[in-house]
């Protein structure tokens, strides 16, 4: 794949990569980390600069094994508030229902965290970089054109 950036850009991505990941949120950064760890040449492109504002994030216990596999459990714990369940409240607040993760989920995964999304995303993004992904911030991808040679990416920085 050959990323071709806008001529007015001040920074260019690697001229060739195995995988281009567009979007430096949780999914994109996680995928970039895993692929870079496998030795793939990865370029991770994010239209903003981290840390950046996003709504959320309420993590679930099923996320914990992934954080462990990435080697990020302690970093996520450091930026998060422990959460052992969820409470559902009716619109008029007449009914409440609390569910403990250990009772409703896998009892080996009794908790997760509530995190500030900007911090969470930055931890994952910087981890992808530490795993070997080339990261490009402030880069808006406008077009990806595929041909027999691979793909050309047009972006603005």
Task: Label each residue range with its predicted role.
Residues 1-13:
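Basic/polar N-terminal segments that are highly enriched at the extreme N-terminus
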Residues 11-25, 43:
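Beta1/beta-strand and adjacent pyrophosphate-binding region of the FAD-binding site
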Residues 16, 90-157:
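Conserved N-terminal helical subregion
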Residues 28-29:
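N-terminal Rossmann-fold NAD(P) dinucleotide-binding loop
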Residues 36-55:
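Glycine-rich FAD pyrophosphate-binding loop
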Residues 40, 72, 133:
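Short phosphate-binding/catalytic loops that engage adenosine nucleotides
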Residues 52-93:
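N-terminal FAD cofactor-binding segment of flavoenzymes
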């Amino acid at each position: 794949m050959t990323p071709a950036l806008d001529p007015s850009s001040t920074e260019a991505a690697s001229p060739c990569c195995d995988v281009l990941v567009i979007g430096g949120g949780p999914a994109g950064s996680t995928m970039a980390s895993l692929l870079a760890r496998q030795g793939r040449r990865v370029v991770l492109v994010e239209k903003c600069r981290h840390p950046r504002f996003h709504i959320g994030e309420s993590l679930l216990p099923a996320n914990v094994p992934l954080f462990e596999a990435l080697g990020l459990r302690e970093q996520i714990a450091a930026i998060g508030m422990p959460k052992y369940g969820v409470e559902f409240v009716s619109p008029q607040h007449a009914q409440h229902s609390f569910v403990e993760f250990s009772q409703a989920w896998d009892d080996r995964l009794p908790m997760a965290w509530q995190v500030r999304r900007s911090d969470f995303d930055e931890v994952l993004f910087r981890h992808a970089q530490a795993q070997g992904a080339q990261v490009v911030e402030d880069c808006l991808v406008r077009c990806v054109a595929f041909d027999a040679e691979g793909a050309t990416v047009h972006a603005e920085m």
